[in-house]
Amino acid sequence: MDAFTDFSILADGLASLGDESSHTILAEFSPSILDGPFVADSAPLTEAPCNHDQIADYGSYCVVA
């Protein structure tokens, strides 16, 4: 499974949460997600820790939704 597929599965999970936006979703991605086009094109990295506006924790970085 590649990083994009992992992200798609996570996005589906987020959609199923509905209005429960206070939940923090943490997911482990392969290192390739940090080098991939998704992050470069549409998801700026921020310093950890993640909060409910951010969907993935990778080491000391978060991928912002």
From Swiss-Prot:
Q: What does this protein do?
A: Activates B-regulated development.
Q: What is the disulfide pattern of this chain?
A: none
* Record gene name: BBP1(2)
Name of this protein? Mating-type pheromone BBP1(2)
Query: Where Cysteine methyl ester occurs along the chain?
Result: 62
Q: How does it sit in the membrane?
A: Lipid-anchor
Q: Where does this one sit in the cell?
A: Cell membrane
Origin species: Schizophyllum commune (Split gill fungus)
Question: What keywords are assigned to this protein?
Answer: Cell membrane, Lipoprotein, Membrane, Methylation, Pheromone, Prenylation
Lipid modification (S-farnesyl cysteine), residues: 62
Please tell me one Gene Ontology term that the record gives under cellular component.
plasma membrane
Which molecular function term from Gene Ontology is one that the record holds?
A: mating pheromone activity
Question: Any chance you could tell me the propeptide residue ranges?
Answer: 63-65
